Amino acid sequence: MASSSSLYLLAALLALASWQAIAFDPSPLQDFCVADMKSPVRVNGFPCKNPMEVNSDDFFNAAKFDMPRSTMNKVGSNVTNLNVLNFPGLNTLGISLARIDYAPLGVNPPHIHPRATELLTVLEGTLYVGFVTSNPNRLFSKVVHKGDTFVFPKAMIHFQMNLDHNKPAVAQSSLNSQNPGVITIASAVFGSKPPISDDVLTKAFQVEKKVIDWLKSQFWESNY
């Protein structure tokens, strides 16, 4: 019969193995793995560029995060992403960044990041922020000011709104994935291609078909 210490050791090893199995962005197995965007190889992520061809510029991006972006759209916000898709040096490093500009009363509408937790820092202005848990849908919200931070747990529906009627606001988000992904709830439901069946949506939202038709007819503009 195995000793108690052996059983404890086995349990610990199994726990460590299962933790690795459920990790979204696994720890890198080399110093770096700059993404080779031209490679025909398809993997869960991106293959590595030849390390002998890597130079300092692969770890640099002139993101100009100090420059304001246009918020001339229906929602009054603009999200500028810095992730592995436009910064290959982030490949396997499990991190990305975003600048969010808000017009007066602008909104970053309810959305989720399926692969990342988000830490938001307010750089300018005052924001109303919040997230909704899984069922039974509890809301956690807060008014945050310049210098404040707020965290949105992974895959939770969340949002931000600039409360000022006259001044823009700016925030910066850090995310613990090289490619967090984003699903904007309204446009995903009413602007999917091909569209979701009216029968599904009328029952789900408990409204008449004409309401669903009107919502589907809207131009669901992206702020990304």
UniProtKB/Swiss-Prot annotation:
Glycoprotein in keyword set: yes
Which cysteines in this chain are paired by disulphide bridges?
A: C33-C48
InterPro entries per record: Cupin_1, Germin, Germin_Mn-BS, RmlC-like_jellyroll, RmlC_Cupin_sf
A Pfam family in this protein? Cupin_1
Q: Where is the signal peptide?
A: 1-23
Question: What are this entry's molecular-function GO terms?
Answer: manganese ion binding
Q: Does the keyword Cytoplasm apply?
A: no
Residues in Cupin type-1 domain copies: 70-213
Q: Where in the cell is it found?
A: Secreted, Extracellular space, Apoplast
Please provide the record's keywords in A-Z order: Apoplast, Disulfide bond, Glycoprotein, Manganese, Metal-binding, Secreted, Signal
Glycan-modified residues: N78
Q: How does it assemble?
A: Oligomer (believed to be a pentamer but probably hexamer).
- Role this protein plays: Plays a role in broad-spectrum disease resistance. Probably has no oxalate oxidase activity even if the active site is conserved.
The molecule here is called: Germin-like protein 8-4
Source organism (scientific name): Oryza sativa subsp. japonica (Rice)
What's the name of its gene? GER1
